[in-house]
Swiss-Prot record:
Its EC number is 2.7.11.22. This is Probable cyclin-dependent kinase 10. Induction: Up-regulated by Pseudomonas aeruginosa, PA14 strain infection but not by Pseudomonas aeruginosa, PA01 strain. InterPro entries: CDK, Kinase-like_dom_sf, Prot_kinase_dom, Protein_kinase_ATP_BS, Ser/Thr_kinase_AS. GO terms for cellular component: nucleus. Residues 315-358 have a biased composition (Low complexity). The gene is cdk10.
Amino acid sequence: MRSVLSFEKLDSIGEGTYGIVSKGRDKETGRIVALKKVKIGQQDKDGIPLTSLREIQILKEIKHPNIVSLLEVVIGSTGDKIYLVFEYLEHDVASLIDNINKPFKLSEIKCFLLQLLRAVEYLHSHWIIHRDLKCSNLLYGNNGNLKLADFGLARKFGYPIESITPCMVTLWYRSPELLLGCQKYSTAVDLWSIGSIFGELLIGRPLITGNNEVDQIMRIFNLLGEPNEQIWPGFSSLPNFKRLNNIPHQPYNNLRELVPTISDTAFDLLNQLLTYDPTKRITASDAIKHPFFYENPFPQSIEMMPKFPTISKSFKNQNKKQNNNFNNFVQNNQTNQNNQTNQNNQTNQNNKTSQNNNMDSYKYSK
């Protein structure tokens, strides 16, 4: 087993619940990697934390183009720490949303979503639930590839479904059954999270932002309408339902108001992902086949997905002026991809205008 001294630390990427991630360079090969330093708490003195053991075990067993690859495990310089060495991708989707300050194009969202669904379909077919799907765990490379990361909370499941700890998924992406204390859950919890991610990509901010579990479930009820036993049999028997006081009598689904401009087909997929009853929630396999992906605009090809400048940790804290410079860079980059088409359209517009001075002004739309 190699030592972390085999790598040169380049930059700090971020810190999660179960590890600190840095950008590094392999001194032998020159390859750029991501180094995840595993947090070892007081209870872990005698070994590697269970979350890290699960992550290592699962990542060694799976291989998919839309799942981040674990390259190796190395020991710390003093021998009492371990580092997980991953392939490096330049961005995570949450940082892109925060720094671009504008929603992605629908064709780009379709490309993102398809790649995510394929990764999750693969996991579920291998009896694995990720349990922590969120935009910050979706890595994006400037080659257009999206890869699912952070398997610290992932675990295998079986049939019949056994009891599993419900408080795993990050609050804003947590499904109603988990918020209400359901312990016998399965792959549907990941699909709710994907619905939350889909909504976030559409509106450019997290979809439902509760302050705690009770606030989160109340916000869900306000957005999607209060559930009942007819649409979600058994929900009122879940452990945490009795903790809810003053449930708003709000029978209407208001989700459409958040995304008024998307097509009915797009809204149908979003609605099926954010379905109360987990047994009726759409699966990853069925979502991939949804008509949303077969209507205009079609999913952007990976090769034509936009490239973004590297967002360092310090960059994320820069002032508004610098952030606007970043936005201009992105907009110029995306504009240049279709520059010739835009020029041709503008030329045609000018020709038509000059041919007939009595015509109404011809408005050019990008």
